Amino acid sequence: MSDPDYLPLTPGLRLEYRVRRAQETRTLVVEQSSGPDGSVAVRRTWTAPDGASETETARVERRADGVYENGEKVLPLPARPGAAWSLPPRAYRVAALDAAARTPAGDFAGCLRATYLIAGGDAGAGERLYAPGVGLVREVCSDEADPFEVLLTARGRAAGEAAR
């Protein structure tokens, strides 16, 4: 039996999130498309309540030891409790593989729960929940400078992408 895919790289995948910060709530749309050399291009578009938007694109690829975004590990493989990695100033650790998450897009079981400390815990902490076959479904961050919550609100296929 293969390990669950907690961060699927699927051209055509479209995920929509509500991102709540102290000053406002934005919509985040994440769309995946085919990239060079077997990678996936991930486009993230944040839209503010006034309609203003900003977009960034990243190259994401699966390697033997993890999933990498623009060359930096964002999730270790295989995913096992206790596995650790860092993206300074954050230090991550897989805390569990049996977490549950409730979001506007549905209820998810068997989730990977990754916890993190910001600047060794001096600047805050957070947790991310990744559902098998879906990816990130919830994140709560108590960053002292800018706390936020990310919740999955919808998932489907990107317009113009054929189903695979």
Predicted segments with their positions:
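Conserved functional acidic sites
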Residues: 1-164
